[in-house]
Amino acid sequence: SSMPDLNYGPAASCATNPTFLALVDAAKFWIDKGVDGFRLDAVKHIYDNQTSDENPTFLNTFYTTLNQYFQGKSALGYKDLYMVGECWMGHGDMAKYYKGLPALFDFTAWENWMMYAINNSHAKWFPKDFIGAQNTFKQYRSDFIHATKLSNHDENRARTSLGGSVERAKMAGAILLTSAGSPFIYYGEEIG
């Protein structure tokens, strides 16, 4: 079974849609309580066509609306609201979602690069591909935040994916924490 879709109307005019405004009001409630960031799940599924501009357009409107509100309310002096989206796609398709959000989780870096490199002791192409992805992201947002991670609630823990090896899990953590980007550690990942 599945959950019903929320109807935000056309992405280009979603800012006046009652459903959109209700979502914004819910987020403002939490901003008023002191929340300074949000994680958005499955952002490629807001509108059905994952490769059109509808989802990035919606996300840009949502982020811009909330960021303006946040900037007027921030007692902590933060410049911008932090918002990261889960966009489980290859870099080419994912990159345009940076038109909508400042930060996106990078699933490809873990699945295709780090895990392969660590499991196969071969990573000579990893830095070039990583920098190439970041250059692609910059085409859509100059101030993008590359949200790197090893795992999340939809995946096996990194250590499990690495055959249970403590040494490989430590290597994965070292790569995560020393690579460019803003690393995320899914709770419990730090203990294997």
Show where each model-derived region lies.
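Surface-exposed cleft-lining segments at the edges of enzyme active sites
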Residues: 158-161
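Short acidic/histidine-rich active-site segments
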Residues: 186-189
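Short, histidine-centered active-site or binding-site loop motifs used for metal coordination
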Residues: 10, 42-44, 154
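Active-site-proximal helices and loops of the catalytic beta/alpha 8
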Residues: 25, 39-142, 146, 164-167, ...
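Catalytic grooves of carbohydrate-active enzymes
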Residues: 31, 152-154
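Short acidic/polar active-site loop segments enriched in Thr and Asp
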Residues: 36, 183
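Chitinase-like catalytic core of GlcNAc-active glycosidases
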Residues: 1-32
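Short, motif-level signal for alpha-helix interfacial/capping segments enriched in acidic residues
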Residues: 18-20, 166-170
